[in-house]
Amino acid sequence: MILLKLYLTLAAILCQSRGTTSLDLDDLMTTNPEIQNEIINKHNDLRRTVDPPAKNMLKMSWDNTIAESAKRAALRCNQNEHTPVSGRTIGGVVCGENYFMSSNLRTWSFGIQSWFDERNYFKFGFGPTRAGVMVGHYTQVVWYKSYKMGCAINLCPN
């Protein structure tokens, strides 16, 4: 059985207002093992809360190859297009991707929580609870077969 890898990208568009944040871009770099742990722990914590509970939810772990792919996606600064499938295929597995964009710096936990909060518009066994709502970020976070991930952040000029 081929297990899916989850590939998440936090492609942040950042235009800081003076004095509104104490975060620095360096504080969010995914080359920092503490940031990697924050991202993994947040995903695993949220995945444990799905309702109904998954019978066989896999635990997420960090993957540097996926993180490099996420970095390439984040560097593109393309907020309207996902990476082509060929750019998201790692080890023969097509990976999903999530983007989070903000006009000011946010923690990784904030962005991941915003994806997870799409659960308010999702019903297990049914799908979106109404037309036009986003639930794909949520389903990427909680997909039970996903077990590896990598993330990246970038400051985009526009």
From Swiss-Prot:
Residues 41-158 form the SCP domain. Gene3D superfamilies: CAP. One of its GO terms (cellular component) is extracellular region. Keywords: Calcium channel impairing toxin, Disulfide bond, Ion channel impairing toxin, Neurotoxin, Potassium channel impairing toxin, Secreted, Signal, Toxin. Contains 8 disulfide bonds. Its main location: secreted. Disulfide bonds join 77-156. It is found in: Secreted. One of its GO terms (molecular function) is calcium channel regulator activity. It holds the Pfam family CAP. Residues 1-22 form the signal peptide. SUPFAM superfamilies: PR-1-like (SSF55797). Expressed by the venom gland. Belongs to the CRISP family. Blocks ryanodine receptors, and potassium channels. This is Cysteine-rich venom protein VAR7.
